[in-house]
């Protein structure tokens, strides 16, 4: 997928040596060991760049991929999905990047509303998603074992994280859990959450091979230490 590197011309001009090394690895070699579709590869790449806080690289990849490998609606949902995991403080700049790229590409905004919940049913529908992904017994046990004074975090997970975002149209369950896995893997230091979302990926039908492929694709952006940590957790959960 060399075309994804088309907008990195400044590096090519000013540091052709690094340009050749990185292009060969990130846009050729890693793809030889991945079974992801082109769409999935772009989604996980964009997800990792959000979590890496790399808006310039995100913009360049988005310019090359929107309306070719991913739709504007999928990009919007990717960005929405990032908020409960990376936080709006980290996601904020990427909203501006997406607006600028869409404007340059002639994509009219705002896009169609994709919400499927109301203020009355968002918690119920969010809990249904939690139960589906992680098992009703596990979610209930988590709620029961949460100390007093902290149970509102479970309420936030039900309503905000899962109710407001996971229920939306635009990305399917497999895509949402895959990019969520990448958000968390990119961060590093969130091993318990990564374990949970490794299991969540398996529950919605993503395979161990797909998770390994996702880490393979994002390795050039997140580095070896975090990639190897993620592989260790994949192997632990999938053994």
Regions found by a protein language model. Give the residues of each.
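Helix N-cap / loop-to-helix initiation motif
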Residues: 37, 70-74, 172, 205-209
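Short, structured motif recognition centered on aromatic/hydrophobic residues
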Residues: 41-49, 78-79, 176-185, 194, ...
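Alpha-helical bundle segments that constitute or directly flank the non-heme di-iron/ferroxidase center
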Residues: 45-56, 189
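A short structural micro-motif
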Residues: 50, 68, 81-88, 185, ...
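Hydrophobic/aromatic-rich structural module bridging two neighboring secondary-structure elements via a short loop
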Residues: 61-97
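Extended hydrophobic/aromatic segments used for targeting, binding, or gating
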Residues: 196-198, 204-218
